[in-house]
Amino acid sequence: MAFAYYVVGSYKRNMITHDPNTNVGFDFDFNIVFNNKHGYSPAKLKNALREALNKIAKKYQFDFPEDSTRVLTLKVKDRKQSRIIYSIDLAIVNENFTKYIHFDKTYGVNEYAYKWQAMPQGYENFSIKFETLKKAGYSKELRDEYLRRKNNNRDNNIHSRDILIQTVNDLYQLKGLYLNSSSALLLGHSNMYVLK
């Protein structure tokens, strides 16, 4: 199965932060897009990625991947200190980045637990809005506001990517910026690979 990967989130935008008093490690986010010309089910795609990661995880000091509702997560842990050094989140998305494979844990791990689901509200046109804010000269204001919100966040269920997306959407609206019909989807650098 061939796939492409795209760097997403704060790493792609040079906005990774570290607060030694509160953060434990950091993470990298990637979107995986399979060349799904055979129409494989979401479960088959997720299992193919999981099996490939299982084969290489230990070689690179990762634990085996953990399956959450949205991503497969690889973690490198400092076992002596009982902490995560860093992790990688891999979301499988469709080719136009409008849906991701959702894992419904109430079904257990089976064919029916995985389905395509629309991206959460706020994800649409995120890359375009981010680039528009940068080009309009709001990079520092965006970074400062993102850091303020991230440092004030006390809810472990709210991820950095969600804080970044909300900050971009709020600042975009606050500055009165609008998408026009000629806006193009800005994608990150991708590489093509084949799972064996």
Task: List the model feature ranges, each with a label.
Residues 1-28, 32-39, 43:
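Active-site nucleotide-donor binding segment shared across nucleotidyl transfer reactions
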Residues 1-3, 43, 63, 84-87, ...:
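The feature captures the alpha-helical scaffold/lid subdomain characteristic of nucleotidyltransferase
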Residues 7-8, 24, 33, 71, ...:
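Extended aliphatic helical segments
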Residues 10, 16, 29, 73, ...:
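Residue-level signal for functionally critical sites in structured catalytic/ligand-binding pockets
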Residues 24-26, 49-52, 108-112:
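Short, low-complexity, polar/charged sequence segments that are solvent-exposed and flexible
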Residues 28-39, 91-105:
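Short, surface-exposed, charge-dense and proline/glycine-enriched linear segments
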Residues 29-33, 55-58, 113-120:
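Glycine-rich loops and low-complexity Gly/Arg-rich segments
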Residues 46-98:
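Conserved catalytic core of two-metal-ion nucleotidyltransferases
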